[in-house]
Amino acid sequence: MRLEVEQEDDGRWLAEAPALPGVMAYGDTREEAIIRVETLALRVLAERLEQGERAPELDRLFAAA
């Protein structure tokens, strides 16, 4: 999943997952922002699956043979 990461004017880092609207996180470092947004993205995808929704973002990770 593609992430967008940028440094804000106040020095904090913002990372977001454009494929999942609203999934964004701040961090004091670039790495911290990435870890936080990855964690949030996984939680959102897990909740979708628990609700019985498809999560096309996972299609590249899992393939039924």
Describe the function of each predicted region.
Residues M1-R2, E31-A65:
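Short, charged, surface-exposed hinge/linker loops at domain edges
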Residues G11-R12, M24, A41:
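A generic structural signal for ordered secondary structure
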Residues A19-G22, E57:
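Generic low-complexity segments that are intrinsically disordered, proline-rich and/or Lys/Arg-biased
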Residues P21-E32:
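A short, exposed loop/beta-hairpin motif centered on an aromatic-Gly-Thr core
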